[in-house]
Amino acid sequence: MKPSSSCNLLTILGPTASGKTRLAVSLARELSGEIISADSRQVFRRMDIGTGKDLHEYGAVPYHLIDVLEPGQECSVFTFQRLFLRAFQDISARGQLPILCGGTGLYLDAALRGYRMVEVPENPRLRTELANKSDTELAAILLHLVPDQHNRTDLADRNRTIRAIEIASYQPDEQEEQEPFPAIQPLVLGIRWDRAELRRRITQRLRQRLEAGMLDEIQQLHTGGVAWERLDYYGLEYRYGGLFLRGELNRNDLFQKLNAAIHDFAKRQETWFRRMERNGVTIHWLDGAGDPVAGARKVISGYFA
C-alpha cells in the first residue's frame, strides 16, 4: 500500500502500556513507514529500561527522535516540534510515510495542531520579580495564566514553575517572521483498553522493568553525572527509583507507590486524549484486547490503496 493524498501522517497514540509501538511497527512494515517517537523521555540516550524503548521490536523499521539527546539536557515542546518537523520533512521527501507514535500529549499537540512553537528566551527581569514569591504564590500566578494546566510537574518544582510562567507570559515580536507550518493531514489511531486490563498490563510491565535492571540503569545515570533532581524530571520510574536508591523508600514501597503513580498517569493521558477530541482531533479508537492491527487496516483502507 502507498500513501494517498488524503493522509501524510499516520499517528498512533494511547496510554502507557497500551501496545502503541507494536502496532506502529506492524503498520510501518505494511505502509513503507518510518516511526517518529512522540515520547518525552525516549529522546534521551542511556535511558532505555525506564522509558520502555523496546528497540528490539522495531527490527528493520527506521525510527526517529529516539536517543538524540544526552541525559541532563532538556527537551522542550519547542525542541520536540523542531526535531519532529525535520524528521517529517525528511521522511516525506524520500517517499516514505511518517508514523508518529507516542503518548506525550504536549508533543502530539505540537505535531498535530498545525502551529509553530516559539522558542522562549529567559527573561531576567521577570525572574527577578518572581524570586521572592513563595511556591504557593508562583503556582497561583501560573494557574492564572494557564487555567487549564495539565502538566502538574510544573507545579511541583519551583524552577519549573518559574519557567512555565516565563513561557506563559512571553510576548513574541510581531515583526518576527515564522516559517509556515507544513500542511499535515493526519490520520489518528488510538489504542483503548478496559481499565482493569490496562492496570494489569501496567503492573506486569513494571515488574518486568525492575527485573530487567531499571534500578541499575538509574544508578548508572546518577553515577555518570545526572543529578537526582534532574532525574526527577524524567518521569515516574526515575523519580521513585531515585528515592529508593537514596534510601527514602524500601523495596515494597517503591513498587506500590510507583505502580499507583503510573496508573494515575495513564488516567491523565486518557483525559488528555479526550481533550484533544474536544479540540477537534478525530481519533479512531481500536480495541487493544482484540486485534488492533486488523482494526487499523479497516480504518486506513479509505486512506491508502
Swiss-Prot record:
**Protein name, please?**
tRNA dimethylallyltransferase 2
What is the annotated role of this protein in its UniProt record? Catalyzes the transfer of a dimethylallyl group onto the adenine at position 37 in tRNAs that read codons beginning with uridine, leading to the formation of N6-(dimethylallyl)adenosine (i(6)A).
An annotated Gene Ontology molecular function = ATP binding
Q: Which InterPro entries match?
A: Dimethylallyltransferase (IPR039657), IPT (IPR018022), P-loop_NTPase (IPR027417)
GO biological process terms, alphabetically, are: tRNA modification
Q: What is its EC number?
A: 2.5.1.75
Which keywords belong to this entry?
ATP-binding, Magnesium, Nucleotide-binding, Transferase, tRNA processing
Enzyme class (EC, first level): transferase
* Homology family: Belongs to the IPP transferase family.
Please tell me the species this chain comes from.
Trichlorobacter lovleyi (strain ATCC BAA-1151 / DSM 17278 / SZ)
Annotated ATP binding lies at G14, P15, T16, A17, S18, G19, K20, T21
List the residue ranges of the region (Interaction with substrate tRNA). Answer: 39-42
Q: Where is this site: Interaction with substrate tRNA?
A: T104, R125
Which cofactors? Mg(2+)
Query: What is catalysed by this protein?
Result: adenosine(37) in tRNA + dimethylallyl diphosphate = N(6)-dimethylallyladenosine(37) in tRNA + diphosphate
The gene designation is miaA2
Alphabetical list of SUPFAM superfamilies matching this protein: P-loop containing nucleoside triphosphate hydrolases
Q: Which NCBIfam families match?
A: miaA (TIGR00174)
